[in-house]
């Protein structure tokens, strides 16, 4: 996509990859129950020890211990995604102005899903977490306001992927 929107700076690629990872991690956290119904688990096995696919599919509010383990893993995924979003934002300055706002809004909408997941730890096994039109509109307005200040914000790229030698990140 970088070539399509005219990104020429090589530092932009690292940030773009990290932004994509942040968004994908949000998807993983949001879709735990839905994915389990399709016989898929994307949470790292070492974050959910002794929890099977069947456990994920049949989780309910009465199975607190397993629910707590899954909820903690989801929280870790969201916390990790935040670090990747920050790296993505660090590279926005390299993206042409014509594409920058749209990318910033999309990233903040996805990040908003993560914030909503964090605020309701038990919702993941009842329904898919999404943002309603009001929440999306509010995030869009905030993003536009923050967008003005991006050149003055001190987003610093930090190497994250190197710190996960045993993970597929």
Question: What kind of region is each of these model predictions?
Answer:
Residues 2-22, 29, 33-169:
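Catalytic cores of Mg2+-dependent Asp-rich isoprenoid enzymes
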